[in-house]
């Protein structure tokens, strides 16, 4: 396995956006890699390995830069409880989707991409319409469905997790900077089980190719260290409008890769 420079650059860019805006690594990088001729089993498991490490790394630095409170001291913080809840539902869904997609039904990739893109576009539009509200009602119960849906997306195509959980948090009334940190850590934990699911089906003859691992991991890890500082210093109002607009771009980009 060797380092591929342009893959490192792409991984760095998409992870920088992912750990800063809560989305984009798998959703943006997967279609590009498939267009370059790589197979899903060369891409999806590797993205899950990388996201497992970068998610934890970004989560630690988000905590250090005080974008979020992940403390366990005396009483578990609200943010940590939300993270664990999102993770629990996401883990169940990602295990189910990996088995269903790559071992049982083998759902067509284009169908999955179209579904994820339309979902992200719809949620991005809702988040933009919500922007004019000065305050949001905290509704944590909404997160159960978003977390399960995001985990299902992640297992199918390696992407579609961040946009759903991130926008789901915003629609549930969670502060933008905290939401970005929460999705990073939750995605890291969910990705561990996702990769473990691929290891399980590999024992039944499904082959995993690790050729992209060094390049994707290198670019992603560097970005995961830098991005929490960006979240810390950039005003929250910027993220409030940037995140849904970026989601719309991700949705349009994904659809264009499928149909153009």
Predicted feature residues:
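Juxtamembrane transmembrane-helix boundary motif
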Residues: 1-19, 28-42, 59-155, 170, ...
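Transmembrane helix-bundle signature of multi-pass membrane transporters/permeases
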Residues: 12-15, 44-52, 180-190, 247
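Transmembrane helix boundary and interhelical junction motifs in multipass membrane proteins
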Residues: 21-29, 157-166
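Helix N-cap / loop-to-helix initiation motif
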Residues: 38-40, 174-179
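Small-residue-rich midsections of specific transmembrane alpha-helices
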Residues: 50-60
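Residue-level signal for conserved functional micro-sites within the alpha-helical transmembrane segments
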Residues: 54, 194, 220
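Alpha-helical transmembrane segments of helical membrane proteins, especially in multi-pass transport
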Residues: 188-201
């Amino acid at each position: 396995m060797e380092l591929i420079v342009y893959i490192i650059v792409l991984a760095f860019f998409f992870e920088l956006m992912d750990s800063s805006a809560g989305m984009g690594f798998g959703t943006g990088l997967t279609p590009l890699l498939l267009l370059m001729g790589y197979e899903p089993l060369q891409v999806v498991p590797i993205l899950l390995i990388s996201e497992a490490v970068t998610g934890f790394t970004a989560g630690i630095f988000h905590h250090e830069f005080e974008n979020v409170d992940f403390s366990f001291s005396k009483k578990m913080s609200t943010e940590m409880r939300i993270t664990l809840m999102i993770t629990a539902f996401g883990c169940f869904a990602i295990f189910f989707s990996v088995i269903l997609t790559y071992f049982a039904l083998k759902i067509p990739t284009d169908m999955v991409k179209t579904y994820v893109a339309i979902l992200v576009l719809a949620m991005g539009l809702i988040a933009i319409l919500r922007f004019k509200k000065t305050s949001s009602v905290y509704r944590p119960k909404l997160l159960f469905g978003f977390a399960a849906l995001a985990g299902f997306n992640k297992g199918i195509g390696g992407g579609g997790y961040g946009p759903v959980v991130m926008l789901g948090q915003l629609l549930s009334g969670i502060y933008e900077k905290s939401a970005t940190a929460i999705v990073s850590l939750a995605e890291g934990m969910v990705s561990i089980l996702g990769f473990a699911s691929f290891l399980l089906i590999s024992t039944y003859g499904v082959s995993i190719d690790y050729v992209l691992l060094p390049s994707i991991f290198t670019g992603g890890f560097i970005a995961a260290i830098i991005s929490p500082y960006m979240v810390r210093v950039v005003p929250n109002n910027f993220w409030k409008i940037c995140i849904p607009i970026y989601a719309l771009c991700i949705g349009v980009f994904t659809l264009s890769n499928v149909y153009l």
